[in-house]
Amino acid sequence: MLNEYTSFRKVFIMVSPQIKDGMVPAISFALPFLFAPIIVFSSLYGGFSIIIAPLFGYVFITICDFLIKISLSNPDPNSKKNLVYHKAVLWLWPLIQFFLIFWCIYVISNHQHLSVGESVFLMMAQGMITGAVGITFAHELMHQKSSKEKWLSDILMGMALYGHFRTEHLLVHHRYVGTDKDAVTAKYDESFFSFFLRVLPSCFKSAWEEELSRLRKINLPGSSLRNPFWRYGILAAIFLILSFAIGGSFGVLLFFTQAFIAILHLEMANYIEHYGLTRKLMSNGKYEPTKPHHSWNANHTASNLLLINLQLHSDHHAKP
């Protein structure tokens, strides 16, 4: 088992890519926008068209990763290039995702051309997009300093009914990654099923406790309006009410379906990113600093365009 683990590490942990020109044009990161016409087409025509989005996301991108040369270049972290166009890709996505989710609920609820199976599968395909693209974009936005970008992040996470992820990720995961205090560092030999059942309550609990602790330091109660859990809850409620207004109880069920698939994608990524990796506890009682070898990386070109370089995870923890 250990030999298999070592081999896996050699294949997938490619740390310290070379710093070259490296900056990928902003238009390249607009690849996920192709999902929009695919989902609209699938919702209108049904049948085998329902599987186009999963085929594109899971199969076509994977084939491209095998055919396209792995990229070992990296942008200069001290580059002064204007990233406004890169950010514009992120800013546009919440509107596109909002449209896609509620378009699907509207079409399914108000037209009869899709069977129940096609309807559920369409929402699962949308859930793949909400998770793989929406949450990935939300992750990038929540790390920005602008309050407006954090709002966009919260809106995207609200569409997955997983708003507390921002608190858990920023205040818990980045501080405790690779330790027992971080729920989303998967233990060596832990199955994904066990991991998933463990992190669902653990992440919510740790995020809530972290916000309570933060508020206590400024002498405010947990019920304070400065607790972002108010925002997380209100956004989730708005999306659920809108789902009900468009499609009734079935509309709410459809919304829950895509949200669950989105959460599943997020936690699959969390499971892989630090699986079996730990930081040493030093003699001073503190954990060693987070280093490149505390994250799994993948330098595959196509999937990194789709996931806006999420798989270069060592870079992310070095400079979040």
Q: What do the PLM-derived regions correspond to, one by one?
A:
Residues 7-20:
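Short, Lys/Arg-rich, polar N-terminal cytosolic tail immediately upstream
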Residues 20-68, 84-109, 117-131, 224-268:
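Alpha-helical bilayer-embedded segments of polytopic membrane proteins, i.e.
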Residues 59-68, 126-142, 163-166, 199-207, ...:
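Transmembrane alpha-helical segments that form the membrane-embedded catalytic/substrate-channel core
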Residues 67-82, 278:
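Membrane-helix interface/capping segments
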Residues 76, 81-200:
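Intramembrane catalytic core of multi-pass membrane enzymes that act on lipidic substrates
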Residues 148-215, 278-320:
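Membrane-proximal soluble regions of multi-pass membrane proteins
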Residues 197-240:
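All-alpha helical catalytic cores of prenyl diphosphate-utilizing isoprenoid enzymes
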Residues 248-295:
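A beta-strand-loop signature enriched in Asp, Gly, Thr, and Trp
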